[in-house]
Each structure stands twice: as structure tokens, then as C-alpha cells.
Design a protein with these regions (language model features):
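Metal-dependent catalytic neighborhoods of phosphoester/phosphodiester hydrolases
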Residues: 77-78, 101-108, 138-143, 147
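A general structural detector for well-ordered alpha-helical segments in enzyme core domains, enriched
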Residues: 48-52, 78, 110, 114-118, ...
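Short catalytic/ligand-binding loop motif for oxyanion handling, primarily in non-cytosolic enzymes
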Residues: 24-26, 73-75, 97-101, 136-140, ...
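Histidine-centered catalytic micro-motifs
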Residues: 89-96
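Alpha-helical scaffold elements lining the catalytic groove of polysaccharide deacetylases
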Residues: 98-120, 180
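Active-site beta->alpha N-cap acidic-glycine motif
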Residues: 2-88, 130
């Protein structure tokens, strides 16, 4: 999205991104609502995504939707609706597991299964990834190697601040390419 000012200054680029996950999948609820019970909770995504897509269309805004594989598996038509509206569909992992809770093998399987499912649904390559809760932190640089090996071209997981459970304080604040085992 590009916005211009009335005073003649150059336009500013904005990135509009959405994490597509159910309300009961956020980390704050992980001890109250285990994954084994997710399917028993009512979905609120269909209405929310439809409303958001209508609003974005009205304002001629295009964005990237980081879709959880679990959601895509249960609501493939919602994922198709996002793609048909001209938005990018990217991966948010499959199970909403934070990267720092997984081994490299588990991380690879999670991103691989999510990417394959999303590509099957939308019929086009999925090149973007965002870890749940911005959970790629210092010490997890191996995640970038795996993302590159699995065919991702960019990552949107780094939050350049320090917080208790997320943040990568020395991360670049501008868009940049990911490389092998470095940020």
C-alpha cells in the first residue's frame, strides 16, 4: 500500500499483514485449550475474513495473509477466497507452535506440511513465512536455513525488540533478504 501526502513529499510504503488463526489458538490460551480440543471450538474466521476482505477491497488495499495450516485444512475455501481477492497467501506454520519450542526436525515438518497444504489449496507457490508469536529469537538462526531449503523466499518473524517470549533486538528494521544462518 502506498500513501502520499499533500505537501509533495515522496509516498510512503506500508505493509498490511494478517495472521490467520483462530481466537482459541493464541499462546495465552495454550494451557486452557489444548490442541486436542481445537476442533470442538466454533470458528469465527469465515465471517471475520470475509468482512476484512470487503473492507480491504473498498480501500483498494492488498496484503499478505499468514495462514495457519490447521486453519487451511479445515477452511480451505477461506484460503481460496483470500487468494481470489488478490492477496498473498503465506505460511504461519501448521500448529501455531513457537519456533523456540521445536527442534530443527519438528520445525521443518511444521513448515513443510503447512506450505504443501497452502500451495495445494491456492495452486501457486507460497514463498513467505511468519513464525507464530514472532518466535524466531537469537540462537534460532538455523530456522532460516530450513526456510530457504523448503523454498521460502522471505521471513516476517523477526521483531526488532526485546520481550520476554519474543524479539530479536539486533534484527534489521527495514525489509531485507534472509541468508543462511545469519540475520
Amino acid at each position: 500500500m502506498v500513501t502520499a501526502s499533500d505537501d509533495g513529499t515522496p509516498p510512503v510504503r506500508h505493509f498490511f499483514t494478517v495472521d490467520v488463526e483462530e481466537y482459541f489458538q493464541v499462546n495465552a490460551f495454550e494451557h486452557a485449550i489444548p490442541r486436542s480440543e481445537w476442533a470442538s471450538w466454533p470458528s469465527r474466521l469465515e465471517h471475520a475474513i470475509t468482512t476484512l476482505l470487503e473492507l480491504m477491497d473498498r480501500h483498494r488495499t492488498v496484503g499478505t495473509f499468514f495462514v495457519l495450516g490447521w486453519v487451511a485444512d479445515r477452511l480451505p475455501e477461506v484460503v481460496r477466497q483470500i487468494a481470489r481477492a488478490g492477496h498473498e497467501v503465506a505460511s504461519h506454520g501448521f500448529w501455531h507452535r513457537r519456533a523456540f519450542t521445536m527442534s530443527p526436525v519438528e520445525f521443518r515438518e511444521d513448515v513443510r506440511s503447512s506450505k504443501a497444504l497452502l500451495e495445494d489449496i491456492v495452486g501457486q507457490p507460497v514463498i513467505g513465512f511468519r513464525a507464530p508469536s514472532f518466535s524466531i529469537i537469537p540462537g534460532l538462526e538455523w530456522t532460516f536455513d530450513i526456510l530457504l531449503e523448503e523454498g521460502f523466499r522471505y521471513d516476517s518473524s523477526l521483531f526488532p525488540v526485546h520481550r520476554r517470549e519474543y524479539g530479536y533486538p539486533r534484527a534489521a528494521r527495514d525489509p531485507h533478504e534472509i541468508g543462511r544462518a545469519h540475520v
